[in-house]
Amino acid sequence: MNLLTIFVLVLIIVLIYAVYQIMTKSTTKVSGFSDASKSLSVPCSKFGANANFGYSTWIYIDSWQNTVIPPANPPAANAAIFFKKNILSRVKDGTTALFNLYLDNAQNDLKLLINGTPTPCTIKNIKLQKWVNITISVYGNTVDMYLDGKLVRTCVLTTVPTALATSDTLYVGGGYQTQTSTWSVLPDGDLRGYISNVVYKSDYFTPEEAWTIYSAGYSGAGMFDFVNRYKLNFSIVKDDQTVGQVSI
């Protein structure tokens, strides 16, 4: 192997590393493939916290189920409200919900609550029995919701979200209940299906990044698989004649 070939190989490695660093900057894979009906807890110490942030995940809704929970008799003034189709919930101190991404109990509408805002940001008619990519991007008090790589909803919060902390816990799947401003996990939920490739970014997602994640597919690792889907072909030319080829 001559010096020119070695130089080209080193240059290729440097370029690929630079592309990888750009594509994965501030981005962490939180969890892989999981049963959506079971609650999976992930300590947020593994992926940090920031004022601007984003989550991306794939969901597959296999079937729709509603568990009827009988009300108390007589009904309590502060009766618990059950959310049986949790996708992602970030919780502070085990009781305060900072971020709730879930499906409506009665219909296939995607809803997002941040910092307990009274009105959720909603996307109606999420497709059933099909893998769907959801990417949430938070910048200040603006929330962008992407579905399959396309921006479909922007919501403006009345206040800037509470800063996230590495001591928070992220719950993937399962369900939860709220009562008098407190939050508690339900180990089993009504979301029959799967959740795959949950990705956290300690900054907002750009439209290009949302599309890249969707393009990578549910079976990959989101942005981490983007580089692996492409190959680079280089030809080594001497006196207008190809003397070697390198494929990465």
Placement of each model-derived feature along the sequence:
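Extracellular glycan-associated modules
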Residues: M1-I248
